[in-house]
Amino acid sequence: MAVPKRRVSHTRAAKRRTHYKVTLPMPVKDKDGSWKMPHRINKTTGEY
């Protein structure tokens, strides 16, 4: 069973977690020219 030999300090854990970045999806232009988020329904045209 995998058990750590030593406790990981708060600083060390925080340094490791700095690489877990969240990237936001970029908005795309719809057929009517409005910007929307991808994979969302446009309320005016009803397109996905």
UniProtKB/Swiss-Prot annotation:
Top-rank taxon, per record: Bacteria
Q: Where is this region: Disordered?
A: 26-48
Keyword ATP-binding in annotation: no
Annotated keywords: Ribonucleoprotein, Ribosomal protein
The entry lists its GO molecular-function terms as: structural constituent of ribosome
Q: Which Pfam families match?
A: Ribosomal_L32p (PF01783)
Q: Which GO terms describe its cellular component?
A: large ribosomal subunit
Q: Which GO terms describe its biological process?
A: translation
Q: Tell me its family.
A: Belongs to the bacterial ribosomal protein bL32 family.
The name this protein carries in UniProt is Large ribosomal subunit protein bL32
Gene name tied to this protein: rpmF
